[in-house]
Amino acid sequence: MNYQHELKGIFLSNFNLQNFVNYLENDIDFPLIKTSLAPYGQVMNILLGDNKTIKYDFGFVWLMPQAVIGSFNNLINGHVTQFTSIMTEVDDFCNAVIKYSEAFKYLFIVSWSLPSYFRGIGLRDLKNEVGISNCLMRMNLRLADNFDTRKNIYLLDSQKWIGNAGEEAFSSKLWYLSKTPFNNIVFKQALKELKSAIKTISGDSKKMIILDLDDTLWGGILGDIGWENLKLGGHDFTGEAFVEFQSALKTLKEKGILLAIVSKNEEAIALEAILKHPEMILKKDDFIGSEINWDDKSKNILTLLKRVNIGPQSVVFIDDNPVERDRIRQSIPEVYVPEWPANKLEYTKALHKLNCFDIDGTSTEDLERTKLYLAENERNNLKSELNSVDDWLKSLRTVVTVETLNNQNLQRTVQLMNKTNQMNLITRRLTESELLSWVNQKNHKLWTFGVTDKFSNSGLTGILSIEFDDKIIRIFDFILSCRVMGRKIEEIMLNHVIQYSKKNGVDKIVAIYLPTPKNKPCFDFWISKSGFTFIEKENSFIWNFSKSVPEIANIEVINNS
């Protein structure tokens, strides 16, 4: 879902959602959302109706359970009700939602909840088969189970919003006045969650956290008190809070979020503290890089980002000092700098409240991301030691494996397609089902390219797809991860499609470049290194078959396609 334009969403409910959609309409943060309210009180008719003509980017369904599950309403009102009857109705509702979801690229369903003051049958309310709270929890689990394999249905947790709102979540006054059950604080929480979900699905999650050291990763000023006297762990409540904060950062790192350091300190002393302090949860190898010196932090951040080849829009900067935070906001506005609590005991909570690290599925490459970047540092160090690029490439002992799309690489292929910006010819964003539908057309073909070398297995890092018609091939997707750019993988990919074209009697290969604010590196490669001829008026590149296909030395290619 590309949210650079205004997104259109249709909102379906059995209570008054007007306050919620008003907030969405007037919120200026991306993505901008144009709302449409479905007719009130027509839930099942709409879910089961003919929705083929719907022209919305996404759907959003938020319901009160007792108004859509009749057996559950009977239970609430004290009638003897069979649990199996309730679950049958839940399954029927899920089937209707699944049918409705076919009209959308994405459909968001809000989990069911009851007012926090609702006591059900009191002490026995969590008892199996008789308790209303017990039943509601299992109804929500049934929703999750039924939607688990549906790639375009996302279940949002309303209990988070209600919990954050506390006792003010439900409003009796609004309910009796306008059939609006929730106070606006709940709607504001829901707005944040929905927009965060859209960003996550669109591959716009943050990839990296840059951290200060003093009073950020540990308590105290290292240069003044020495590493032995830092507040970190031990029998100290502040030290314990810093250990918990580091543990939370470590968890994010294990999920694929990169960590780095930018700190005003003496580098040798700082690295000694990281190495020697027995309570350090984060070790040196947990960070993909550091800039520890007395230079301006904005300069150091830009230096670090250039070295690891990550754009500032993918970065979060955490620093306890409000002056430093303001400096980065002013000098590098693309970097997200959250407000940070003065109370060090609140650091872990503040980190968990950031919703910019959510991901829509995790691949092997995500879990190994820090190792891959550390391996890239080793490659760059080796490059600086050798006399030429060819010597460097030869020393890497690179192997490229070519495959067609399959069940094993589908998730990673879609992830790479939806996240890659720089080396991306047309910046096409597709879901798994949409990509499979496209590839399964008889005149379409897609290859993936995996890269390994002596330092690491970078995994699936390249995608090339084509459409062929008689004697003409059009290159659609030409995508390469920034981790392997500039290592002749681009040329290997083009050689593959040229050789394929020759074998199949093709007369013409054309690639149309669709510019975005982020994919100029792709254009630069095609202009200077692809060997294709640029046709400016068409913004396209043409291969001249009178040319010989250049040999790419020092790289082994294994073709499993």
Question: Which residues fall in each region the model found?
Answer:
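Basic, amphipathic juxtamembrane/active-site segments
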Residues: 222-247, 333-340
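Glycine-rich phosphate-binding "P-loop"
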Residues: 230-237, 277-296, 303
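Substrate-recognition element of Asp-dependent hydrolases with the DxDx(T/V) motif
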Residues: 244-278, 291, 328, 412, ...
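Conserved Lys-Pro-Asp/Glu-containing loop-to-beta segment of HAD-superfamily phosphomonoesterases
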Residues: 301-322, 328
